[in-house]
Curated annotation (Swiss-Prot):
Residues carrying Leucine amide: 143
Family: Belongs to the FARP (FMRFamide related peptide) family.
Residue numbers spanned by region Disordered: 25-106
Species in which this protein is naturally found: Caenorhabditis elegans
Entry GO terms, CC: extracellular space
Entry comment describing in which tissues the protein is expressed: Expressed in the ASI sensory neurons, the ALA interneuron and the AVG interneuron from where secretion occurs. Expression in the ASI neurons is necessary and sufficient to maintain serotonin-induced fat loss.
Name used for this protein in its record: FMRFamide-like neuropeptides 7
Propeptide cleavage-removed residue intervals: 20-49, 161-177
Length: 177
């Protein structure tokens, strides 16, 4: 009894191994064609579709879908070979970002460089440091240009403003009468 079970198991295992090898060969054939860059002919594609049910189920069992690489191209799933060709033929992929910088398209990296080299408005503290601002407040006081703060203090401390001049004009008129 034990011997016949063992033989059945061995036979079943052998069938499974053979089915896996045949499935591997069928998957490897199209990949070799893809590497050389050739398209499969219509006859080959039709032959793939006419696969026996046993083959399909065994392929699923061993983790391979019945759709092979050649049919993946037809149904729009990308194989590794296609990804590299996408980069070549100008569809945007993450790899191209470095080349975008090279060919002068603006990337986030370049924006920070623009700030560094003064193409974008720098913040005021940097502008004062590099002497680019019109004039900072301390030097404005020195050069006698009025800031809003100075005007209010002038009124407070009795320096001439428009109101003060008007009052003095009225007094002068009264004195002359």
């Amino acid at each position: 009894m034990l011997g016949s079970r063992f033989l059945l198991l061995a036979l079943g295992l052998l069938v499974l191994v053979l089915a896996e090898e045949s499935a591997e060969q069928q998957v490897q054939e199209p990949t070799e064609l893809e590497k050389s860059g050739e398209q499969l002919s219509e006859e080959d594609l039709i032959d793939e579709q006419k696969r026996t049910p046993m083959q399909r189920s065994s392929m699923v069992r061993f983790g391979r879908s019945p759709m092979q690489r050649s049919s993946m191209v037809r149904f729009g799933k990308r194989s590794p070979m296609q990804r590299s060709s996408m980069v070549r033929f100008g569809k945007r992929s993450p790899m191209q970002r470095s080349s975008m910088v090279r060919f002068g398209k603006r990337s986030p990296m370049e924006r920070s460089a623009m700030v560094r080299f003064g193409r974008s408005p720098m913040d005021r503290s940097k502008m004062v440091r590099f002497g680019r601002s019109s004039i900072d407040r301390a030097s404005m006081v020195r050069l006698g240009k009025r800031t809003p703060m100075q005007r209010s203090s002038m009124v407070r401390f009795g320096k001439r403003s428009m109101e003060f001049e008007m009052q003095s004009n009225e007094k002068n008129i009264e004195d002359s009468e």
